[in-house]
Swiss-Prot record:
Catalytic reaction annotation: carbamoyl phosphate + L-aspartate = N-carbamoyl-L-aspartate + phosphate + H(+)
The protein's name in its UniProt record: Aspartate carbamoyltransferase catalytic subunit
Keyword entries, A-Z: Pyrimidine biosynthesis, Transferase
PANTHER family linked: ASPARTATE CARBAMOYLTRANSFERASE, ORNITHINE CARBAMOYLTRANSFERASE, MITOCHONDRIAL
Pathway: Pyrimidine metabolism; UMP biosynthesis via de novo pathway; (S)-dihydroorotate from bicarbonate: step 2/3
Top EC class for this record: transferase
Pfam families in alphabetical order: OTCace, OTCace_N
Entry's EC annotation: 2.1.3.2
BP GO terms, sorted: 'de novo' pyrimidine nucleobase biosynthetic process; 'de novo' UMP biosynthetic process; amino acid metabolic process
GO cellular component terms, semicolon-separated: cytosol
Species whose genome carries this gene: Chromobacterium violaceum (strain ATCC 12472 / DSM 30191 / JCM 1249 / CCUG 213 / NBRC 12614 / NCIMB 9131 / NCTC 9757 / MK)
Binding residues for carbamoyl phosphate: 51-52, 101, 129, 132, 261-262
Record flagged with keyword Transferase: yes
Alphabetized Gene3D superfamilies for the sequence: Aspartate/ornithine carbamoyltransferase
Amino acid sequence: MYRKHIISIPDFSREELELVVDTAARLKQSPRGDLLQDKLVASCFFEPSTRTRLSFETAVQRLGGNIIGFADGGNTSAKKGETLADSIKIISSYTDAVVMRHPKEGAARLASEFSAVPVINGGDGSNQHPTQTLLDLFSIRETQGRLDGLTVAFAGDLKYGRTVHSLAQALSLFGARFYFVSPEVLAMPDYICEELDEKGISYTVADSLEAVIPEVDVLYMTRVQRERFDEAEFRKIQGQYALRADMLKHARPGMKVLHPLPRVDEIAVDVDATPHAYYFEQAKNGVYARQALLSLVLNETV
């Protein structure tokens, strides 16, 4: 993976995904403060972020590296009309890697074509969020003890939620079975379903969250975005795809609830105290997964 661009999950082999997860587990168990010594990473966030940006910056510094960058594209020369290609040419001439989030789909792939150093996609529009998927895989294996043959439900906004697109693609390499629970207007995109069909991966489209909970090893919740509905329709959908603690009474003992965060109303606060809640530990795992990725991309051996 040395000097590899990290743009989308389909660019990874199963073996590479396992390598990142294994390395993350090792770094969580035995921290290393020297893996990015003398390395400089650019953190280029053209779109707001809390967890992704801060966990990347934490990862770089804990590995002994240095970081430069910006948290808002409005404060850069992009506001003056500079193209992304020109910006990346310049930024990559200063640094050893570029971590980038951008609101436009395909922006990370474009950046990689003009960068002199590896580009790591921190999210491009509603398209891909590969490093979120890596921390999700790490959290899933940490809680389930394996990645192979799991049953996973995705619930909420499956159309615009880039995290579920990437994670479905990744877990398909491990023979997962899926439940897709969403309103019809926010269903999993056809291209993801077609990819799963081609691989012979089983999935079921469902409209009842409570009905699928007893069947799954992992429940992956996402936020239904208020701005996509009128108020009456949103209130109806919101209640239908919100998780409460009482809905977990028939869940498998080891089942874990994940969420890319931020949550709004789709997971009630009373779920936090249940043994199934794992979304805060999942967010914490973002540092270890991103440490692993940076170490593998910027070192020939780790």
